[in-house]
Amino acid sequence: MPQLVPFYFLNQLVYGFALVTILLVLFAQYFLPQILRLYVSRLFISKL
């Protein structure tokens, strides 16, 4: 299994951290603000 060969550990760590960083930026910049706006607008509408 290639994931258990020590030569590939650094490659997997680099791609893993890169993927987590990209996902974190995408969620923080694009998806979560839209979800928050939707939640707040629904909250204000329900309080009327």
Swiss-Prot record:
Location in or out of the cell: Mitochondrion membrane
Main localization category: mitochondrion
Native organism: Kluyveromyces lactis (strain ATCC 8585 / CBS 2359 / DSM 70799 / NBRC 1267 / NRRL Y-1140 / WM37)
GO CC terms in record: mitochondrial membrane; proton-transporting ATP synthase complex
Membrane topology label: Single-pass membrane protein
Function: Mitochondrial membrane ATP synthase (F(1)F(0) ATP synthase or Complex V) produces ATP from ADP in the presence of a proton gradient across the membrane which is generated by electron transport complexes of the respiratory chain. F-type ATPases consist of two structural domains, F(1) - containing the extramembraneous catalytic core and F(0) - containing the membrane proton channel, linked together by a central stalk and a peripheral stalk. During catalysis, ATP synthesis in the catalytic domain of F(1) is coupled via a rotary mechanism of the central stalk subunits to proton translocation.
Family per similarity comment: Belongs to the ATPase protein 8 family.
One Gene Ontology term of the molecular function aspect: proton-transporting ATP synthase activity, rotational mechanism
Keywords: ATP synthesis, CF(0), Hydrogen ion transport, Ion transport, Membrane, Mitochondrion, Transmembrane, Transmembrane helix, Transport
Signal peptide: none
Lineage top rank: taxon: Eukaryota
Origin organism lineage: Eukaryota, Fungi, Dikarya, Ascomycota, Saccharomycotina
Description of how the protein assembles with itself and partners: F-type ATPases have 2 components, CF(1) - the catalytic core - and CF(0) - the membrane proton channel.
Name of the protein this chain belongs to: ATP synthase protein 8
Transmembrane segments: 13-32
